[in-house]
């Protein structure tokens, strides 16, 4: 896949794709019959100019996929949002590669932040799970009002409101870099821990056999 597409951090050169990306996000949501918060071309351009977006390009430098980073609660939480792949390249594994790249971008720019996402797509849930995200309750997400305001343009916003923001049709998933680091350290410690010598019972058994 990496040989077919260039997956890079977006910049000013890629703002020309913003309108196409915005329209494709809306079109994709309508086709799936699921909700998605709308993102204007201007908003997408801002993310590109801030260095908070990843774009996938074909060999001819045409747009193939996109995803961006948002921060909430003063940088304590990061969301990788707006994952979209051009229709002709779907089911090719490109979405997984884009998510991997944007995860790397997020953990590099915000190493202490918790990463989260909300999605109704089974494919995205599978990708997130493979990358280390885990399903959580909405209470574990950011309480930043600006984040939840972004859900207003979703067709399911009334459901979210009626549930007092405790749940909705989206599945919440969380990636905590600190927890992942602790698990890695503990695993390495276990592997490096020297094996204990024979037990007392084994020693006595050996001595008994020698005296036979």
Residue ranges and their predicted role:
Residues 1-3, 107-112, 116-212:
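Terminal substrate-recognition subdomain of acyl/acetyltransferases
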Residues 2-20:
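A short beta-loop-alpha structural element at the N-terminal edge
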Residues 13, 39, 119-123:
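Short beta->alpha linker loops
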Residues 22-88:
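A conserved beta-strand-loop-helix scaffold within acyl/acetyltransferase catalytic domains
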Residues 44-45, 103, 125:
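Short amphipathic alpha-helical segments and helix-helix/interface helices
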Residues 56, 101, 123:
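Short Gly/charged-rich anion-binding patches and loops
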Residues 85, 91-106, 115-117:
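Conserved acetyl-CoA-binding loop-helix of GNAT-fold acetyltransferases
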């Amino acid at each position: 896949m990496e040989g077919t597409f260039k997956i890079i951090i977006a910049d000013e050169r890629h703002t020309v794709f913003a309108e196409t990306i915005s329209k494709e996000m809306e079109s994709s949501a309508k086709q799936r019959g699921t909700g998605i918060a709308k993102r204007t071309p201007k908003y997408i351009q801002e993310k590109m100019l801030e260095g908070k977006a990843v774009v996938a390009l074909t060999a001819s430098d045409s747009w193939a996929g996109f995803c961006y980073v948002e921060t909430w609660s003063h940088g304590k939480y990061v969301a990788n949002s707006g994952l979209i792949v051009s229709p002709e390249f779907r089911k090719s594994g490109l979405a997984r590669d884009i998510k991997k790249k944007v995860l790397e971008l997020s953990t590099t720019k915000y190493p202490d932040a918790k990463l989260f996402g909300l999605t109704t797509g089974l494919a995205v849930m599978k990708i997130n799970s493979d990358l280390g995200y885990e399903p959580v309750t909405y209470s574990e997400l950011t309480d930043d009002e600006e984040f939840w305001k972004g859900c207003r343009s979703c067709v399911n916003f009334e459901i979210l409101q009626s549930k007092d923001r405790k749940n909705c049709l989206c599945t919440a998933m969380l990636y905590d870099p600190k927890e992942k680091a602790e698990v890695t350290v503990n695993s390495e410690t276990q592997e490096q821990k020297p094996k204990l010598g024979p037990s007392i019972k084994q020693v006595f058994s050996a001595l008994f056999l020698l005296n036979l």
